[in-house]
Regions:
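Residue(s) in the substrate-gating loop at a strand-loop-helix junction
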Residues: 64
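Short C-terminal tail/terminal secondary-structure segment
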Residues: 69, 152, 163-177
């Protein structure tokens, strides 16, 4: 109630651990679902009624290209982020008549503490980071500075007729071929 009237919501929570699927325990599943999916659901429940009452707004959910291309050792994370994509598209459709534009940004491998933390849980951290770099057609990890522009666009009036879209920002990782 103290935050005023929300016009933009950016859900950018993320948590991951490198773990081959056959070694994944239910506790890890529950932890990742809680942060990566349930956290977004909770934010939507808090913010959207106020946003709708104020005449609409913009929601940008940050998922991951791991949900779109798969990534060995990230089955639970990919499932969470794929769930966020499906949830987002459905909610975008439900809220389109309420002047709420809801879109998803899917980052590729990004040089952040999150990725470094994931790498540290792998048997060979540097080899994993190199594999991420090599998977990207631009042959580099994204930098945090690669994302504010698309987020700002989707939060702006220039995006008043953009909703339900999933936008990859990954140096071409999801290109066909």
């Amino acid at each position: 109630n103290d935050l005023g009237v929300p016009t933009v919501l950016v859900n950018n929570a993320g948590f991951d651990r490198f773990m081959p699927f056959l070694k994944t325990e239910p506790k890890l599943w529950d932890q990742l679902i809680a942060v990566n999916l349930t956290g977004a659901l909770n934010m939507h429940h808090v913010v959207l009624p106020k946003m709708i009452a104020a005449g609409g707004g913009k929601v940008i959910n940050v998922a991951s290209d791991a949900a779109r291309v798969g990534s060995s050792g990230e089955s639970v994370y990919a499932a969470c982020k794929a769930g966020l994509v499906g949830f987002s598209k459905t909610v975008a459709r439900e809220l389109a008549t309420k002047n709420v534009c809801l879109n998803v940004v899917c980052p590729g491998p990004t040089d952040t503490a999150l990725l470094k933390g994931v790498a540290e849980t792998a048997p060979n951290p540097e080899k994993l980071l190199e594999a991420f770099r090599n998977a990207v057609p631009m042959k580099r990890l994204a930098q945090p500075e690669d994302y504010p522009g698309i987020i700002a666009l989707l939060a702006s009036d220039d995006a008043n007729f953009i909703t339900g879209q999933v936008i990859s920002v990954s140096g071409g990782l999801t290109m066909a071929g």
